[in-house]
């Protein structure tokens, strides 16, 4: 198996292992994070109804203006602050953090820390 295929398999294993344990409820929805090479996305999801309550990403102009590159730690911090602001507007204060199989390092950690600093608790 090629190194890239091994990396994808390892990511999928981490993702399914974490997802089996984490479930978002109406009282405490799930903060899901996805990162690509160019962008980072965050959603707050209620798994009981299967709906996305709040979302933010670097694709949106509000988070990406005055950034040269949207796939870095600074962009992740902005998305974290934006998701926290939008969640608090909808009276969502506590969430369950779902790193989606990504290692808790770099952009994922920056987004989580920024969301905590701006009022979300998890």
Curated annotation (Swiss-Prot):
Family annotation (InterPro entries): Ribosomal_uL18_bac-type, Ribosomal_uL18_bac/euk
Alphabetized SUPFAM superfamilies for the sequence: Translational machinery components
GO molecular function annotation: 5S rRNA binding; structural constituent of ribosome
GO cellular component, one term: cytosolic large ribosomal subunit
Residues of the signal peptide: none
Single biological process term from Gene Ontology: translation
Stored NCBIfam families: L18_bact
Subunit and partners: Part of the 50S ribosomal subunit; part of the 5S rRNA/L5/L18/L25 subcomplex. Contacts the 5S and 23S rRNAs.
Family: Belongs to the universal ribosomal protein uL18 family.
Name of protein: Large ribosomal subunit protein uL18
Gene label: rplR
């Amino acid at each position: 198996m090629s190194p890239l295929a091994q990396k994808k398999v390892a990511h999928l294993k981490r993702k399914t292992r974490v997802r089996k344990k984490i479930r978002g409820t109406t009282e405490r929805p799930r903060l899901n994070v996805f990162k690509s090479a160019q962008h980072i996305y965050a959603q707050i999801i209620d798994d009981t109804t299967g709906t996305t309550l709040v979302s933010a990403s670097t694709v949106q102009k509000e988070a990406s203006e005055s950034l040269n590159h949207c796939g870095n730690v600074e962009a992740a911090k902005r998305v974290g602050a934006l998701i926290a602001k939008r969640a608090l507007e909808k009276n969502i204060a506590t969430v369950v953090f779902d790193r989606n199989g990504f290692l808790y390092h770099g952009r994922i950690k920056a987004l989580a820390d920024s969301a905590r600093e701006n009022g979300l608790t998890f």
